[in-house]
Amino acid sequence: MTTPAGTAGYGEAAEQLAVQYESVSFAEVHRELYDRYPAPPASVLDIGAGTGRDAAALAALGHRVVAAEPTPELRAVGQRLHAGSGVRWVTDALPDLPSLVADGERYDLVLLTAVWMHLAPDEHPSAMAALTRLLAPAGRLALTIRHGPVPAGRRMFDLPAEPTIALAADHGLRLLHRATRADLHGRDEVHWTALLFEREALSGAPAVRSRSEAADIGPSSR
């Protein structure tokens, strides 16, 4: 696999980044969207999984999780830190995700946490097409967009959320929720937009139940 331009600067800093990534919890990072994620057990794909913090947390909740990470050093750290988590690690990268698309599996939830900003705007259409192909009917796509100055030595793009929302709509993905939050690492100049989309369900097919919907159904009703 050709080294993606967006991974520049990550391999050599993998150990330091692991400390940073693992210093915040899955619950903190996903608090704006988490209640709308599918209830377990669901099939989950974490793209740009980094050190596997989110993938391992979701696996611990009972989901079947695939973690895709193109940077070998980060992937190795993740496999070490979260050994025994049950996460299946693969090597693949945006914008086209050729291995995952060719595999043919479809997912109830696809995550792109702090990933989208590494793609140039002209890569977004092919990336969104690949993501849509990986979603099961009624599957959900959770995506965060970074706003703020680009660090030296990194390939990032500071873009508004609206073009991504419009692009998702063009691919049949409906916006379910949008939220803005401060940076969890205390960088005052950085903030984030969290977006959750849903692919249309097949006619007559059961909808994917979210955590909040599952919680509304008491144990005696299940």
Locations of regions flagged by a protein language model:
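Class I (Rossmann-like) S-adenosyl-L-methionine-dependent methyltransferase catalytic domain
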Residues: 1-102, 119-126, 130, 140-222
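Conserved acidic residues
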Residues: 108
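A conserved beta-strand element that flanks and buttresses the S-adenosyl-L-methionine
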Residues: 111
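Short catalytic micro-motifs in class I SAM-dependent methyltransferases
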Residues: 114-115
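Short, conserved loop/helix-junction motifs that constitute active-site signature segments
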Residues: 133
